[in-house]
């Protein structure tokens, strides 16, 4: 099975645009070493993904907890999307295995 297919199976999601998935896995160190091949880093997708994750999490919490005040919702969202929480999720999915990193 192709590496991206394995990742999709782990995620429980099939990406329509495999190129976007692949681009999301290019670390800036890899992109710098392969710039001549048209490879760009995942930083722009990371920016967009952070915004989408924040929105989806906020929408979920807003619907799930209609009686919580804004401050509580903000604190819960911050805890869910913080670097430590996302690191735990990434480790549980072994995402590092799929990243393309540079040599240096």
Model-derived regions, located:
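RNase III-family endoribonuclease catalytic core
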Residues: 1-104
């Amino acid at each position: 099975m192709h590496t991206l297919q394995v990742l999709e199976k782990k995620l429980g999601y099939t990406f329509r645009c495999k190129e976007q998935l692949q681009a999301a896995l290019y670390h800036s160190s890899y992109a710098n070493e392969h710039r001549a091949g048209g490879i760009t880093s995942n930083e722009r997708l990371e920016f967009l993904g952070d915004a989408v994750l924040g929105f989806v999490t906020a929408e979920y919490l807003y619907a799930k907890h209609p009686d919580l005040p804004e401050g509580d919702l903000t604190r819960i969202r911050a805890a869910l999307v913080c670097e430590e929480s996302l690191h735990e999720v990434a480790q549980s999915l072994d995402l590092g295995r799929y990243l393309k990193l540079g040599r240096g």
